[in-house]
């Protein structure tokens, strides 16, 4: 019997079961646990495309028509990295959704072909061999300040934006809110032609239930409570009452100055009801100095924003200026300066690293242009994982590879925010039936720059060379919009997430949009235990005088990183 070395097999078909892959220039390694497209014991007839290769007429390509069920696209031999596992497979896409994960090809000539992955004349091929495939990232904390954010998001592997804003207005620069029916309609129309799913948050800072219901009927997918609008206990309670009645999520930026109460008062106002706590560490805002303690509560779904990810020697220096600009403060006013300085605490930023590694903080978003960088959600997540591996070693269950840690961290920007906001029936993971919002990465550039971003099965963004060259690869190779980013295609492959009450009220007929409006799931019964691989609830204590943080009684010492991967090796600036 002819044999292939592992190295030769990887050259021909990509790595297989038992092979380990380094993620970019980090210390993180993944190991393929299963090869559904070939590999040991199943080698032969792997679905690969090209001259002299398998996927040709009467060989790997069958006669099956699209009407017979042939997929529109097959991604061959990709290593899927998702919260549920790390496996190699062929992935089929049909009508913009994932239709099969397994072995693709022609069942007339090949064994073991998945019935939903029968390649026919109508099937396009994307070579995933040697590449990593992930679900499109979900940024759960977006300030819609300028439209250029959309391009940066796509270039960073993001396919869904949750947040609010109306442009560079002071309210939007500070708070993640699209307030009122008129602004909601205009923003849903404005974002219709980008290949991104959109979920807008209305203003929850009011005791007027009528004002909140008005926003739900106008297209808000949930609410944002922000201290700059007044996150008082009364406003929190009123917003959560409407949320409980409507089924939507509430995101909270609590009261940094403790004017209307302390963290205990906010928790009392929440009264055990589910809530998404933004930037739980507190540098982005929230009760000083102990808002981080909410990550220990079962009804709180905590997230971070990326400027504090991970804790480095530069983190503190940049935060003060960022905060003054974002919250319309003046350094010449002592009270404004005191407000800013109260939010920047190295001890809680350091503890945030640990809480992510334990799975106690469940999500990571950007806080785009409002103390965060939308293009760095994915990158900052993996930098945090790298720093924690160096400091804490392997997680339980990990050894030569870091599969447990990698699965935990990828969940923070895929399935966890999808679950938290009621989007997981449509997006958030690489699973059959979900939208084909997928990102292909070359391992050397994993988390840094995608090879291609698929939105609803269409290639929307990709690394592409000079368009006047004779082949696609000559420099400069840059992330560029592709045909899937064209406005009609983007509308056909993307969703606006709204409340079911907006659909019942006929919102689709009132808006000048082409894309489909989809209702968010009811999230009001969610708890921390519903956050895959990120459901830890350790005891968290903060000393009110020294700001020392104890996690399950142990002090987590500050050791800011002096060097990071995924940084100047990849970027000029």
From Swiss-Prot:
Species = Nocardia farcinica (strain IFM 10152)
Family according to the record? Belongs to the metallo-dependent hydrolases superfamily. Urease alpha subunit family.
Give the cofactor binding note: Binds 2 nickel ions per subunit.
Q: Matching InterPro entries, A to Z?
A: Amidohydro-rel, Metal-dep_hydrolase_composite, Metal_Hydrolase, Urease_alpha_N_dom, Urease_alpha_subunit, Urease_AS, Urease_asu, Urease_asu_c
Q: Which residues form a coiled coil?
A: none
MF terms from GO for this chain are: nickel cation binding; urease activity
- Record's protein name: Urease subunit alpha
Q: Where does this polypeptide localize?
A: Cytoplasm
Which cofactors are named for this entry?
A: Ni cation
Annotated GO biological processes are: urea catabolic process
The UniProt entry's GO CC annotations, sorted and at most eight, read:
cytoplasm
- Carrying N6-carboxylysine, the residues are 224
């Amino acid at each position: 019997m002819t044999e292939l070395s592992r190295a030769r097999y990887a050259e021909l078909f990509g790595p297989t079961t038992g092979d380990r892959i380094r993620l970019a220039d980090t210390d993180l390694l993944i190991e393929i646990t299963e090869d559904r497209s070939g590999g040991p014991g199943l080698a032969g007839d792997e679905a690969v495309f090209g001259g002299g290769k398998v996927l040709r007429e009467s060989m790997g390509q069958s006669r099956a028509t699209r009407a017979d069920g042939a997929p529109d696209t097959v991604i061959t031999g990709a290593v899927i990295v998702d919260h549920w596992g790390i496996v190699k497979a062929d992935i089929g896409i049909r009508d913009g959704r994932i239709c099969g994960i397994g072995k693709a090809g022609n069942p007339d000539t090949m064994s073991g072909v998945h019935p939903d992955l029968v390649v026919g004349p109508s099937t396009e091929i994307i070579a995933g061999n040697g590449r990593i495939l992930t679900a499109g990232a979900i940024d759960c904390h977006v300030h819609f300040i300028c439209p250029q954010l959309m391009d940066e998001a796509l270039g960073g592997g993001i396919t869904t934006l949750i947040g609010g804003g109306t442009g560079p207005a002071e309210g939007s620069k500070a708070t993640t809110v699209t307030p009122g029916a008129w602004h909601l309609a205009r923003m849903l129309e404005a974002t219709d032609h980008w290949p991104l799913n959109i979920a807008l948050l209305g203003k929850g800072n009011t005791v007027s239930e009528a004002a909140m219901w008005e926003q739900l009927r106008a297209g808000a997918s949930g609410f944002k409570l922000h201290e700059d609008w007044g996150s008082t206990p009364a406003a929190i309670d009123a917003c959560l009452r409407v949320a409980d009645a409507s089924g939507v999520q509430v995101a909270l930026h609590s009261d940094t100055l403790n004017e209307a109460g302390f963290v205990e008062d906010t928790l009392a106002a929440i009264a055990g009801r589910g809530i998404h706590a933004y930037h739980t560490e507190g540098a982005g805002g929230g009760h000083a100095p102990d808002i981080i303690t909410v990550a220990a509560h079962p009804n709180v779904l905590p997230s971070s924003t990326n400027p504090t990810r991970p804790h480095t020697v530069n983190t503190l220096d940049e935060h003060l200026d960022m905060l003054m600009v974002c919250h319309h403060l003046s350094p010449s006013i002592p009270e404004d300066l005191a407000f800013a300085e109260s939010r920047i605490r190295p001890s809680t930023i350091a503890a945030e690293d640990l809480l992510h590694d334990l799975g106690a903080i469940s999500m990571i978003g950007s806080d785009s242009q409002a103390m965060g960088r939308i293009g760095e959600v994915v990158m900052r997540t993996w930098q945090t994982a790298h720093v924690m591996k160096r400091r804490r070693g392997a997680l339980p269950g990990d050894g030569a590879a870091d599969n447990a840690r990698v699965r935990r961290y990828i969940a923070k920007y895929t399935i966890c925010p999808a679950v938290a906001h009621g989007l997981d029936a449509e997006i958030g993971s690489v699973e059959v039936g979900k939208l084909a919002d997928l990102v292909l990465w070359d391992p050397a550039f994993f988390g840094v720059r995608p090879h291609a971003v698929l939105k609803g099965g269409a290639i929307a963004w990709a690394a592409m060379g000079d368009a006047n060259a004779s082949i696609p690869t000559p420099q400069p190779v840059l992330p560029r919009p592709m045909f899937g980013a064209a406005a009609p295609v983007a509308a056909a492959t993307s969703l606006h997430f709204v409340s079911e009450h907006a659909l019942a009220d006929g919102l689709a007929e009132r808006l000048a949009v082409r894309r489909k409006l989809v209702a968010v799931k009811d999230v009001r019964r969610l708890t921390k235990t519903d956050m895959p691989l990120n459901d830890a609830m350790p005891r968290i204590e903060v000393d009110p005088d020294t700001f020392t943080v104890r996690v399950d009684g142990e002090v987590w010492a500050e050791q800011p990183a002096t060097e990071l991967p995924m940084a100047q090796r990849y970027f000029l600036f």
